[in-house]
Amino acid sequence: GSEMCIRDRLKIAVAGTGYVGLSIAILLAQHHQVIAVDVIPEKVDLINQRKSPIQDDYIEKYLAEKELNLIATLDATKAYSEVDFVVIAAPTNYDPLKNYFDTSHVEEVIKLVRNVNPNAVMVIKSTIPVGYTESVRQKLDTENVIFSPEFLRESKALYDNLYPSRIIVGRPEGDARLEEAAHIFAELLQE
């Protein structure tokens, strides 16, 4: 039978608490246990006090009013070691002069997850160049990476996650486990 069942409560870590990460963390924390990971102590403290570190009406409202199974932490290693999914929403800075995406933050997360929890399925939500998921799988020697692009407007990020126009999850051909993980993740986003 299937190891992961959508009816089970899953444990999910979210790397990065910008618009993308925080809105996903809040969305998922309505039904699952979510650990939001950031490197900035002030942001972690605010989230744990149920205050939003960013300006977004829905995020502020949900943090204040909803019952969320959400904690924020600076301890990435511990967070990643005990979860089923790691949603990667780390910043990727685009350099227009070099026509280059700096994906180093994303890769740091992938390396750490691979080392502390090789079975966790990683879902990249960060903005990344075309073909990146495949190349990073080879470069970092891990299969467990899927990509789910975002269609969010700043300051409407949580709203757009609550009422998505579409949900896309990309994964490699012929890998049954990732195929299932992709379907589960898509369902999580629609609960």
Describe the residue ranges of each PLM region.
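Short, small-residue-biased leader/transition segments that mark boundaries at the very start
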Residues: 1-6
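NAD(P)+-binding Rossmann beta1-loop-alpha1 motif at the extreme N-terminus of oxidoreductases
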Residues: 7-51
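Conserved hydrophobic helix-helix packing surfaces used for dimerization/oligomerization
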Residues: 12-14, 122, 167
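N-terminal FAD cofactor-binding segment of flavoenzymes
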Residues: 54-55
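A structured beta-alpha segment of the ubiquitous adenosine-cofactor-binding alpha/beta core
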Residues: 59-84
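Glycine-rich, N-terminal phosphate-binding loop of Rossmann-like dinucleotide-binding domains
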Residues: 88-91, 126, 171-172
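Rossmann-like NAD(P)(H) cofactor-binding subdomain of soluble oxidoreductases
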Residues: 94-157
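Internal alpha-helical scaffold of NAD(P)-dependent oxidoreductase catalytic cores
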Residues: 135-148, 153-191
